[in-house]
Amino acid sequence: MKKFSVVIAGGGSTFTPGIVLMLLANQDRFPLRSLKFYDNDGARQETIAEACKVILKEQAPEIEFSYTTDPQAAFTDVDFVMAHIRVGKYPMREQDEKIPLRHGVLGQETCGPGGIAYGMRSIGGVLELVDYMEKYSPNAWMLNYSNPAAIVAEATRRLRPNAKILNICDMPIGIEGRMAQIVGLKDRKQMRVRYYGLNHFGWWTSIEDLDGNDLMPKLREYVAKYGYVPPSNDPHTEASWNDTFAKAKDVQALDPQTMPNTYLKYYLFPDYVVAHSNPERTRANEVMDHREKNVFSACRAIIAAGKSTAGDLEIDEHASYIVDLATAIAFNTQERMLLIVPNNGAIHNFDADAMVEIPCLVGHNGPEPLTVGDIPHFQKGLMSQQVAVEKLVVDAWEQRSYHKLWQAITLSKTVPSASVAKAILDDLIAANKDYWPELH
């Protein structure tokens, strides 16, 4: 079996060790000859990489491992780029969340004004990675799971139309895992689903087991009462996530025939979200206080002891979708996966050039979207508004346009008026002066 060379772009991410453990657990179906980390923050990456070096030496010494801040060294001779970058890191996420809340608007990583701000930082970073890949390994594929995926996907569609990049999100996968628990299946691979929408903005219309039995009635009944909180809920799930999974019952009530993506909470119940937010302590603070500290302390312990048992790093099980995607391309498996792709008529009554999240069959040539057909007015109306926001953000970045970004924030369903949008925008510009292009 062919062995592959992979570079993880965003090597200093706290998600990287879990992805390395997941890659090691999947060597039987996706064997590696080389693994490289790339990051523009060398000091941060070094801690993560040195810990991963210990793990790799123990579990797979035959895999050639290196880490670098040099794009040429990182992107030369690779088959896949696995990208999860966060431009501005968590301190800027904190600004994305807290600035809108100061104006009475929800503050969220990928939704509303915060997601727009993050998108304006991410576009340039992801395009830079695409360009490095095309320069140094023109036959490679980029598997991008950097957020905000919807805005990034629109930017790559428009500004790098021929790039071999696939944009994928783990949120539907996480929700499907909970659905499988609710109906008593071993895992989400025991289900066959139909889903459509945009990234962080979609609906399941059909869920069956592999024998073709309809699981929707049982799911509807359960979710109407408990949301996506499964019977044996993981005690380690943070309070903010538990609230999001529980709130799905109210989102689902709007269209009881479907199962919603949890992120719709932010668009359909923004008043609830603001009322239940603490403007002084947002999700970014939770992550910095817990995940960031825990992963880095575990890595330092592993480095000091020279053995992996010294630190508690968890395998990122549901990140196995990244391996599913890579193996589908490498071995032409025609795996069915939810990807963010140009609509091109898959949803009949929706914009052809909108980036939609729908089931695709994946092989050597990338994704082949499955037909969705017509969608109802409710979903179409919501999606049209949100697609317009995403397109305006890319317009703003490309044209360096203050007005386009003001329009984008005004059009967001989370924002009550153009005057509030302008006040938020002006604060975001001040906070992002080191990251955004200068707007005129």
Swiss-Prot record:
Residue sites binding substrate per the record: R93, N147, R283
Active site: D170, Y263
Keyword Manganese: yes
Principal EC category: hydrolase
InterPro entries: GlycHydrolase_4_CS (IPR019802), Glyco_hydro_4 (IPR001088), Glyco_hydro_4_C (IPR022616), Lactate_DH/Glyco_Ohase_4_C (IPR015955), NAD(P)-bd_dom_sf (IPR036291)
Keyword vocabulary terms for this entry: Carbohydrate metabolism, Cobalt, Glycosidase, Hydrolase, Manganese, Metal-binding, NAD, Nickel
Site-annotated residues for Increases basicity of active site Tyr: E109
Protein name: 6-phospho-alpha-glucosidase
Origin organism lineage: Bacteria, Pseudomonadati, Pseudomonadota, Gammaproteobacteria, Enterobacterales
Gene responsible for this protein: aglB
